């Protein structure tokens, strides 16, 4: 192996070890952040759980940004220049007075420490805004270089706010808690939290009612088109047993959108066929209701007929009717036509018997006799 190949192999090994160590560090930090999040939720529950950003009442706001910032050293909690838009996003009245919104932003940087281990810094902030100026803010920071994790949750109603911040040292396990009151006394904190919870819950109900109202004004779907197919046996002089008449009964739609069943109409044939279409006293018609809305009513009726156990005598459509003798189409007109056929008998062109002559003299004499007769 060449020297270049050996160096590249060592570099790949070092890169793999670094990636494994970084993944292990990230997983450990994520587990620690989840544990702190559970700790904060146990102390101050989230009243916006009913109105999560994935519900119908929430709308993603256009101010949501995910800035791509270069790697910079940390400068304290939420005061570093690497997060210049956090305060603007948190302080803006995103949801207004009639809606709900959710905004979140996250920044993460990675650098190599003196010992070659990766140092990861991650900070995130989120804001949930409800109707009536109700707002909840969450800020988290975790730094593997200092081993410090911080989380702050604030409840805001207009200009009043109650913020609880917790800081934990992962190396020593020490946990500190601080509270901040804005335009609020410490003795009013409990009453303020109850007011915040009630307003947030009421805003969630209003958002859901608004979403339901939008669905209520949608036009109702029209009723499914239904048709009734009737198969009746027919008496016929033939010996065939599979003659029948299939009648399709279509509903009549009124202006109010209701369906009224129309009476079946008789076949548009001659009088004999209309009489033959009546059912016999010994057999009752079978009716199948098809509501699939397509034009293949005959196939659907046959499937229903088979499912009912009548497969031994399948109903087939009637064959083309033979023309009865009484029909004008079956008789030949005897009246003379104004356009006689060219091969018909014509008195002006009568066939004459052909005479046969045995000699030329007989033929010549006959020709002369005919010629003399024409001259006369």
From Swiss-Prot:
GO cellular component terms, A-Z: cytoplasm; nucleus; perinuclear region of cytoplasm; polytene chromosome interband
Subunit structure of this chain's protein: Interacts with DRE-binding factor Dref.
Subcellular location: Cytoplasm
Descriptive protein name: Myeloid leukemia factor
Region described as Interaction with DREF: 96-202
Family, as annotated: Belongs to the MLF family.
Main subcellular location: cytoplasm
InterPro entries: Myeloid_leukemia_factor (IPR019376)
Annotated stretches, region: Disordered: 124-147, 187-224, 250-376
Organism listed in the record: Drosophila melanogaster (Fruit fly)
Comp. bias (Low complexity): 274-318
Compositional bias of kind Polar residues: 262-273
Keywords in alphabetical order: Cytoplasm, Phosphoprotein
Expression tissues: Expressed at high levels in unfertilized eggs, early embryos, pupae and adult males while a low level expression is found in adult females and larvae.
GO BP of this protein: positive regulation of crystal cell differentiation; protein stabilization; regulation of cell proliferation involved in compound eye morphogenesis; regulation of DNA-templated transcription
